Amino acid sequence: MFLADHPFADRSNSTSNTLGTDNPWANQIVPFNACAFFVTSRPTRHYLLSIALLLLLPEFIWGNEATKPAPSYANGAPVDSNGVFTNDKGDIAHGSASVRVPFMLRRFGTYLRSDKGAPEQIQDAAAQLQANIQAGQPAVTWVGHSTTLVQIDGINFLTDPIWSKRPSPVPLLGPRRYVAPGITLEDLPVIDFVVISHNHYDHLDLPTLVALAKKNPQTVFFVPMGNGKLLRENGITEVVELDWGQTTAYKNLTVHCLPSQHWSKRTLTDTNKTLWASWAVTGGERRVYYAGDSGYFPGFTEIGRQLGPFDLVIVPIGAYAPRAMMLESHMNPEEAFDAASDLGASKALGVHFGTFDLSDEPLAEPPQRFLNTGSSATAAAPTPWIFKIGETRSF
């Protein structure tokens, strides 16, 4: 693929060294204060503001009904007639109001929801990781949610790192974290680079990214088109933006920016103005694919044909219920296993479940269904992997 013109993104693949603004959180969300203008009582104003925040939070994770016209594009990631990114099939549906409104109301109850079924956490995670580092084996560690630490060819990289307690524009609100990160930031090895799939708060966690950049200023952050501005404005300097179909070298590895079927939104006014993506990292030692967030789509087969087979495929298996709302943007466990098969995976690691309360399915359901699907598959199918939080395995 070649690059396509896009009004919201500088479609270059060079590393930017532009420093951010004086305020490290300058671009965080502040669209909720309108109601406060009309309220003079401070307690009442705070109460109404809290209610508004709670009602609007789901919009930053699950979005709204697709209304944009069919895509018009030639090269790179599709761009629709409104000048925003879209998918190969056009805009994806997010369910009718009759599905979405009850779903959002149910999210209020999750503040009291039990953590029964949340993933177990191993007790010796740091020691296990350190032992593997000393052994020098290709390995993957599940930190939690979609965050993994991958070690291949002497390189350490992270996928969608989030160490925050809540994926939210407001630290005290949003889905709570059931299980702490399996590895502390302090126990991480030197991180060479990070891949970000899209700008939703459970995947692009600014506090974590800033902390990683401060810990090692040489860490490179690979992001889909349009996402670099937010990082640079928060003081992260080593940022590389890529379009679908673009590749770049990192030492002895090749980093591939690839399609996924999803969407983006971080404020009330920026829907699909930044790109979403999946990633492949290939080298002489191992080939790894990270799906990010995605509905099941034909692109998996094409990626597998062009770049597979993969030694490890990391696929999201949670946040799929209700299906009327999630079908086109989040795979269920069976679809995730099929995607790994399409990609030519040897090992398929299920992630994106059990860490945050994002959807209606029981916390323990995604890994059970994923393993059940794998156990009934043919011998040539991928081996399904479900980790405890903090677990490391070589591959």
Give the residues covered by each predicted segment:
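Acidic/histidine-rich helix-loop elements
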Residues: 161-180, 263-271, 321-330, 357
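Active-site metal-binding motif and surrounding structural segment of the metallo-beta-lactamase
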Residues: 77, 100, 173-223, 238, ...
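Intrinsic-disorder-associated, low-complexity terminal segments enriched in Asp/Asn/His/Tyr and depleted
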Residues: 5-6, 10-13, 17, 22-23, ...
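Cap/insert and terminal regions of metallo-dependent hydrolase folds
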Residues: 59, 64-67, 73-80, 87-88, ...
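Catalytic core of the metallo-beta-lactamase
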Residues: 148-151, 249-311, 327, 331-334
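Metallo-beta-lactamase
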Residues: 23, 27, 31, 46-50, 116-135, 224-286, 369-391, ...
